[in-house]
Structure formats: structure tokens, C-alpha cells
């Protein structure tokens, strides 16, 4: 068998394998919520949070990314940190 025939067979096999690739998947989601209230004549933020999720398979493996943020003018720093930790575990 000559090298040209082997090269043609190899090329056909490679094209056949690469044509069976799975489709690219990308899903993104985000949500945000805020509540404010006037307390002692000042507008205070009771809570302000945002959550972003992203799932894609750009590298061939599903990758899930989760980002969240939380702020409040009326909660103590310890309470804020506890809520942030709970949001990051979700």
C-alpha cells in the first residue's frame, strides 16, 4: 500500500471522528433584588443582592460558575458575612 492511500484513509477517519462532536452548551442566569426603606428620615437599604450563574462546555467539560453579592445598611457586619457565605454555597 502506498503512503497516499494510508493518508487518505487516516484523513477520512479523522473527519468522521470530528463530525460527531457534541453541540456547544452555554446557559447564563442572573437575578437581582433590592429593598429600601425610610428610617429616621434617611433612605436605608434593607438588602441588595445579586446572583449570577453560568454553565458552559467550551473545553469539553461542563463548567459551572457562581457569583453573588449582598449588602445591607441595617444588618451587622457579621450578619452580612453570614448571608454572603450562604449565597456562595447555593
Swiss-Prot record:
Q: Which InterPro entries match?
A: Acp26Ab
Organism of this sequence:
Drosophila sechellia (Fruit fly)
Bilayer-crossing regions: none
Q: Supply the alphabetized keyword list.
A: Behavior, Secreted, Signal
Principal location: secreted
One annotated GO biological process: mating behavior
| Protein known as | Accessory gland-specific peptide 26Ab
Q: Name one Pfam family in it.
A: Acp26Ab
What residue stretch is flagged as signal peptide? 1-21
One GO CC annotation: extracellular region
Where, by tissue, is this protein expressed? Main cells of the accessory glands of males.
Compartments where located: Secreted, Extracellular space
Q: What does this protein do?
A: This protein is transferred from male to female during mating and may affect egglaying and behavior after mating.
Amino acid at each position: 500500500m502506498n503512503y497516499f492511500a494510508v493518508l487518505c484513509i487516516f484523513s477520512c477517519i479523522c473527519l468522521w471522528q470530528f463530525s460527531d462532536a457534541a453541540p456547544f452548551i452555554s446557559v447564563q442566569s442572573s437575578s437581582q433584588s433590592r429593598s429600601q426603606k425610610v428610617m429616621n428620615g434617611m433612605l436605608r437599604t434593607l438588602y441588595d443582592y445579586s446572583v449570577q450563574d453560568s454553565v458552559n462546555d467550551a473545553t469539553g467539560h461542563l463548567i459551572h460558575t457562581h457569583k453573588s453579592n449582598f449588602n445591607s445598611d441595617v444588618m451587622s457586619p457579621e450578619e452580612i458575612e453570614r448571608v454572603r457565605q450562604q449565597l456562595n454555597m447555593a
